[in-house]
């Protein structure tokens, strides 16, 4: 029994590491564009996402804030019920959605466009509605989740967290050079 548990844990870690090892090669023009948009932002970075993406988004907003970039998290449902009023034209929105097709996006994107708010996307589907609407797309796609039943986002949440850290560290480096 304990050997089976160890094997399951090791297999999870190996799959997540394998997926994460593909991230560095995805950094390119869009990553630089996203970092520059944040560096030149005169307002705040507003991070948003639903479900596990939202949980990771809260951490990304906290990392940005703790490294000198004004940032906060807003839940998409709350945004649609008045909290979009907190977002100004000088802000940037980083929306996280693995599928890039969250239904809330259909309502949020036009409002962001009306306010001329720059939209950045972190998604596993760069050609999704979110990816197509964004000024820069950070690709967090995975070939395989570590969950044996393919239900729980595992590898994809690791990739999201790592991409958020990479972005925050790049922005921090850009602000001190």
List each language-model region with its residue ranges.
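An N-terminal, well-structured beta->alpha segment
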Residues: 2-40
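Glycine-rich phosphate-binding loops that contact phosphosugars or nucleotide phosphates
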Residues: 43-172
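Short, intrinsically disordered, charge-balanced linker/junction segments flanking boundaries
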Residues: 176-177
